[in-house]
Regions:
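Pre-Walker A-like glycine/lysine-rich segment at the N-terminus of P-loop NTPase domains
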Residues: 2-59
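A generic structural motif
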Residues: 3-5, 96-100, 122-124
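Short beta-strand segments
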Residues: 10-14, 103-107, 131
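Conserved P-loop NTP-binding catalytic core
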Residues: 32-35, 41, 45, 54-106, ...
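Electropositive, glycine-dotted interaction segments
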Residues: 106-217
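Well-ordered beta-strand positions enriched in small/hydrophobic/aromatic, beta-favoring residues
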Residues: 14, 93-95, 119, 133
Length: 217
């Protein structure tokens, strides 16, 4: 879900919980009694906000994976992110994810003018979410310690990014961090992406005779 991002003021949610339809069962991941889609598509009229939905999650991924040291050369465009804001509220981003070990996590953060206002990570056990860590400004609470006393936290950097590097053996942090590393968001309507695909297909046709024969059937 995301809120106050570009043209979206109110909270919007992309729900990937599977319906009762039985088509394309290969695209469904099952956890206990719940089923989730592995892939989803967004479609709609022109200028309806489809690209901004993708950019919200792409922005979230970049904030997590780009360290503070490399932000100067990063593709994060802070000014463009806020260009459609109509108030002084922070951007709020949150995902509920299914990790590779079938654990379910809820992770999110709020950011205002490139400063992290809050950040949180919860793990789902049975039907309830339990806190792994919660952050307010530069203060982080994580049982059994108050991490702000142990780690120098920059106001622009996410704690998930920091602690994933400090404690590489922490399963919860690595599960969430790796999920973002392996997640992909594609804008099929982007002309640059279309040119990339067309070039790849053209090269495939030129270099692979079997592929060429299949296309000509």
């Amino acid at each position: 879900s995301f809120k106050n991002f570009k043209s979206f003021k109110d909270e919007n949610c992309l729900d990937m919980e599977a319906t009762s339809l039985k088509e394309h069962e290969y695209n469904v991941a099952k956890v206990d009694n719940d089923e989730y889609l592995k892939v989803s598509a967004i479609y709609g009229a022109n200028a309806s906000g489809k690209t901004n939905v993708l950019q919200a999650f792409d922005y979230m991924k970049k904030r997590i994976l780009v360290s503070d040291d490399s932000k100067k050369n990063s593709p994060i465009d802070e000014e463009n992110v806020y260009s459609f804001m109509i108030n002084n509220d922070p951007i709020a981003l949150e995902v509920e994810i299914l990790a590779k070990n079938n654990k379910i996590y809820k992770y999110g953060f709020e950011v205002l003018k490139d400063k992290i206002i809050s950040e949180w990570l919860f793990e789902k056990r049975v039907n309830k979410f339990y806190s792994i860590f919660e952050r307010e400004s530069n203060n982080v609470s994580m049982k059994p310690n108050k991490i702000s006393e142990l780690v120098n936290i920059d106001e622009r950097t996410l704690f998930l990014n920091i602690y994933s590097k400090i404690d590489r053996n922490n399963e919860d942090f690595s599960n969430v961090y790796d999920w973002f590393v392996n997640s992909t968001y594609l804008d099929l309507g982007n002309p640059n992406f279309e040119r990339f695909i067309n070039n790849r297909v053209s090269l495939k046709i030129l270099s692979d005779e079997n592929y060429k024969k299949e296309l000509l059937k």
